[in-house]
């Protein structure tokens, strides 16, 4: 657990007005912090389009028959498409393993989306990729939310 499983938003940051903000890419072209106050008004009403035009740092596209889904690496949204409808935004797409994307991030995003749909409340949401040195891929992702 990070911070005893307590959200790290200050009182000044908390709001019920929907917004989304994506930091500029760093000097190596890597994603930085992504933050949003997510309400139903930000959630997509149409299906996701292709994101294949975005090549995040560290991107490798090789399929393997022995890997579930075929690919070791996925293009991963920092803030999932189902939450804000952001599609091929290079400031919101990182290279991550399929496992991290499907088993790590997706269940958390599903839980947040279900909560918003069921309650019509807003959720403060922040994702920070931690990059060490000149590496292309984050070694850690920290996702925080507050209802």
Language-model-detected regions and their locations in the chain:
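Surface-exposed, interaction-prone regions used to assemble/regulate multi-protein complexes
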Residues: 1-10
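Domain-level detector of nuclease and nuclease-like folds
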Residues: 9-147
């Amino acid at each position: 657990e990070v911070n005893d499983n307590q959200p790290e938003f200050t009182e000044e940051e908390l709001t019920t007005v929907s917004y989304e903000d994506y930091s500029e890419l760093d000097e190596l072209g890597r994603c930085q912090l992504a933050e949003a106050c997510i309400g139903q008004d930000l959630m997509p009403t149409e299906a996701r389009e292709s994101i294949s035009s975005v090549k995040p740092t560290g991107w490798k596209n090789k399929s393997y028959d022995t890997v579930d889904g075929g690919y070791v690496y996925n293009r991963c949204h920092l803030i999932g498409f189902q939450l804000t409808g952001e599609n091929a935004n290079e400031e919101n797409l990182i290279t991550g393993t399929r496992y991290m994307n499907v088993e790590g991030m997706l269940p958390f995003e599903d839980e947040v989306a279900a909560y918003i749909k069921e309650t019509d409340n807003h959720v403060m949401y922040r994702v920070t990729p931690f990059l060490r040195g000149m590496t292309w891929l984050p070694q850690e992702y920290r996702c925080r939310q507050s209802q």
